[in-house]
Amino acid sequence: MKFVFDESAWEDYLWWQTQDRKVLKRINMLLQEIARDGNEGRGKPEPLKHGFHGYWFRRITDEHRLVYKVVEDEIRVAACRYHYGR
């Protein structure tokens, strides 16, 4: 599987590298699980609704979500900070 980050998601990911290594470690663990198991596993994966067809989210923390979509051999990461479209 190949990871493809939206520009804002990549900025979020880089932000975590300087702000909270523990959260960054959790994001990396969730990404590994997505690559291995798709839409099952930790972080309570759930599909997004209301116009976000095909996108899923997992809980990183109580405040932050990892939003992604699995397309063939790619995992497209849309966000990894805050809730959904914030």
PLM regions and their residue ranges:
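Enriched for short, Lys/Arg-rich terminal
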Residues: 2, 8-25, 29, 42, ...
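Short glycine- and Lys/Arg-enriched binding-loop motifs that mark or flank ligand-binding interfaces
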Residues: 37, 47-50
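Short beta-strand micro-motifs in enzyme catalytic cores
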Residues: 54-56
